[in-house]
């Protein structure tokens, strides 16, 4: 029987932040994808909880049930990641977490590894790389009048980046995950994605880190994964190419993604 997911709130820098929690044990902190919410992890959380983790997945600022910081979206990856780290510190009870991020969350996870690796047990960066200038400039599209078709465009941008064939109901659910966050916030996420720049910082990573790329994902070419891995000290980093998954492994095939993560953590003697 799957463990129950419960909802909680925490206040960070006068900003009310929502997070899902499931299970007990070592903190396993999950950072969601651009324009979505913690819902993207709804199938993954109970599986990791059954593996002995206290799994935590916040709604990023301005997403889902979380308020934005100072009523503005983030537009810079490092600033975004530093705020998310404050969330992790507040909810992990003083314990070192395993940090797992996907897509924009994967970029954040990599940024956190560069700046806070000594405070992490391990990091899993799914669809994250040292640079991700792989999305158009959306800085002029924050307001609805600037791009009236934004919602459908963004939903398609998400649903086309998964592995096919995929059950139609899973595609519909993924589109819904990207339907209820405002254009203002989603455009901020797009700007944040292209601002990612960990060049020169990868040498600072001191904890085990896995770079996970879904084979069907076209937002992060394998070349970027290889360039990222090359900058990490030998023995700490691993690359994994996920079969029959795309941009959202933790949603598309949560059981498979969990097994890959568990195998990595055991191999690196994190657990």
Map each language-model feature to its residues.
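Alpha/beta-hydrolase fold catalytic core
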Residues: 1-29, 50-53, 93-94, 180, ...
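Gly/Ala-rich beta-loop-alpha elbow adjacent to hydrolase catalytic centers
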Residues: 101, 105, 109
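Conserved HGGG/HGGXW glycine-rich cap/lid loop of the alpha/beta-hydrolase fold
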Residues: 15-67
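Conserved catalytic-core motifs of eukaryotic protein kinase domains, centered on the activation segment
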Residues: 40-42, 66-72, 135-136, 222-223
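Active-site loop/oxyanion-hole signature of alpha/beta-hydrolase fold enzymes
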Residues: 50, 57-100, 255, 259
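Conserved loop-alpha-helix segment in the C-terminal half of the alpha/beta-hydrolase fold
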Residues: 206-245, 251, 256
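Flexible "cap/lid" loop of the alpha/beta hydrolase fold
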Residues: 110-115, 120-150
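Conserved alpha/beta-hydrolase catalytic His-Asp/Glu region
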Residues: 134-135, 150-206
